[in-house]
Amino acid sequence: MFVPEEIIETIKMIEYQNLDIRTTTLGINLKDCADKDLDLLKENIYDKITSLGGNLVETANKVSQKYGIPIVNKRISVTPIGLIMGSTVKGLSDEEAVDACVEVGITLDKIAKEVGVDFIGGYSALVQKRATYEEKMLIRSIPKLMTKTDKVCASVNVATTKAGINMYAVKKMGEIVKETSEITKDAIGCAKIVVFCNAPEDNPFMAGAFHGPGEGDAVINAGVSGPGVVRAVVEQLKGKDIGTVSDEIKKTAFKITRMGELVGKEVANELGVNFGIVDLSLAPTPAIGDSIANILEAVGLERCGTHGTTAALAMLNDAVKKGGAMASSNVGGLSGAFIPVSEDAGMIEAVEVGALRLEKLEAMTCVCSVGLDMIAVPGKTPASTLSAIMADEMAIGMINKKTTAVRIIPVPGKDVGDYVEYGGLLGTAPIMPVSEFSSEELIERGGRIPAPIQSLTN
């Protein structure tokens, strides 16, 4: 039974503090779609996704209306395409294999537009130890795919705590991101490419979502968003000790998560599929007040990025997890605080005044999910430097047994002090400086950084 105060509190959260369900993502298994014939493969994929996901948008809108809770994005994630291309590309030349992968990606884009979802994720490869031929071709095809599609997101898992870091793949992904930046408008294609360590199989958030090989046939995963709500709570705690702040954030996260699970289960029930997880991640938007940086500043920092930022973020992330885990037994995905620069108005301001630099963002990723996200850098940045930034982030994830990722955008013709405007959820990215010193010799070595001693857990 809800008391009137709780109902009023929820209305306030939605109306004034930007509380919403960021995404309901339908994960779909495509392993049974594999076929030697490319046309049959595409037909199988089309039939499977449209039959299971054709009503996703309509259903999510209906549930949103029923509860009065906005569901901002409706998305689909699929089995990593690298896992189902083997028989299709067997015997083809490299060029033909790349084109076959792109055709599958174009089919995914067509489906996304037909069913009305915002994005479709799963143009992915899992290459933490080595890449198969079809995965190499899929990775090579990513830049071309980004010029021909609007809604397809690509991700590549290049490292895990158990396997170490595949430095060949890290080198290649730096080159792929660089090439994509040069052939898509304002390097927008790079905003749809994520490089992962320890990628979760049930992530509902783009651009890194895919339907993991250990998942069932179809599942709904939900992601919540409530930085504005948390900030409003913290602002009422002036002068209180940090333990009290943590406790109040925990209580707020409980309420947010409970709402996410309610909506996710309802959408799953209506679609006749299983409910998977609710992702506890606090996901910011470019809207004023809907910012992770603003929460940290409300805790007591003059600007996000100053000394103490990592400690405040660690407290926030831990409190959100504790509150969320109490609210739901089905917690998964990334589940932490996102720090995407272009999507967070407070982060953008911190970069502008010189408080927040790439090195500090890297330190922050040690204590939160998911990594260096939506970072715009000068267009002249060499591929080897992009790879080195990725390698650093992969190392943090590997050693700390957590998910880390890089979504970095070298913007042609732009330099430090410039901006690139994407609009919508992707926001505005200030160009951030990178080191002028080279990492090329390290990246050229290739090989695999061995798994750390903490991987030996048996």
Curated annotation (Swiss-Prot):
Please name the InterPro entries in this protein's record: UPF0210 (IPR007841)
Tell me which domain of life the UniProt entry assigns to the organism this sequence originates from: Archaea
Q: Which Pfam families match?
A: DUF711
CDD domains recorded: RNR_PFL_like_DUF711 (cd08025)
Q: Which NCBIfam families match?
A: PRK05313.1
As for family, the record states: Belongs to the UPF0210 family.
For this entry, the protein name equals UPF0210 protein MMP1427
